[in-house]
Design a protein with these regions (language model features):
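Active-site-facing substrate-recognition patch
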Residues: 1-66
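Short, well-ordered alpha-helices that flank and scaffold nucleotide-derived cofactor binding pockets
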Residues: 58, 87, 91, 142, ...
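Glycine-rich helix-loop-beta junction characteristic of Rossmann-like nucleotide cofactor-binding loops
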Residues: 60-69, 115-119
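Conserved acidic residues
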Residues: 73, 122, 152
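Short, glycine/charge-rich flexible loops or terminal/linker lids adjacent to PRPP-binding catalytic cores
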Residues: 80-125, 132-135
Length: 204
């Protein structure tokens, strides 16, 4: 595998580990799709986790502005999906800090652990395993900015946009692979439903 894995190499890893599957899936937000993607299924395997994280770190290092920040850069994720990627990227970059935000329960806002407080002016890269709707990254970005931290880039293993994907404006968005899936707003508009293809609900 290349130092920076190609799109086809990433897809092969995802399929070989069961992280990427074809079928008829309904996500928690109600969207229907012809693909299931859960990157943690690939991140279970150390070598794959290392390859994907190092590949992402190389994309960050290739950006001259971000490269200049590395000695003081923080890598921040949300629990739990982004944690393996965050640690892998931080190690490969030799960035200064890695930490995360979490929720007490599903409907609670994100927060940092006691005594973990981003510093005003702290330069941060937000990291996650996948960007689909971007809801978690939007909330995490707002949380960091409430402390005065500066988000300088987003870095995700897989970018799989859908009709509800957040707009992050001019903020650099780096990804090892971009995947396109067919999305349908509801059962009435879903071609897979019209074909009576069996449904599998995605619960996480």
């Amino acid at each position: 595998m290349h130092l920076l894995p190609t799109h086809d190499e990433v897809v092969r890893v995802l399929r070989d580990t069961g992280a990427l599957r074809d079928g008829h899936f309904v996500y928690p937000n109600g969207l229907h799709s012809n693909e299931y993607l859960q990157v943690p299924l690939a991140m279970r395997y150390y070598q794959h986790a290392k390859t994907l994280s190092v590949g992402l770190s190389r994309l960050l290092r290739a950006n001259s502005e971000i490269r200049a920040m590395i000695p003081e850069l923080s890598i921040v994720a949300h629990a739990t999906g982004g944690l393996p990627v965050a640690y892998g990227v931080c190690e490969a970059l030799q960035a200064k800090r890695v930490y995360w935000a979490e929720r007490d329960s599903e409907n609670q806002p994100m927060r940092f652990r006691q005594f973990i407080e981003p510093l005003p002016g702290e330069q941060v890269v937000l990291v996650d395993d996948i960007l689909r709707s971007g809801r978690n990254l939007v909330e995490l970005k707002a949380l960091l900015e409430s402390y005065g931290a500066i988000v300088v880039a987003l870095a995700v293993v897989v970018y799989q946009p859908n009709p509800r994907t957040a707009n992050f404006g001019d903020l650099p968005l780096l990804h090892v692979a971009r995947l396109e899936a067919s999305y349908y707003a509801d059962a009435a508009s879903c071609e897979l439903c019209l074909k009576s293809q069996p449904i599998e609900k995605v619960w996480i």
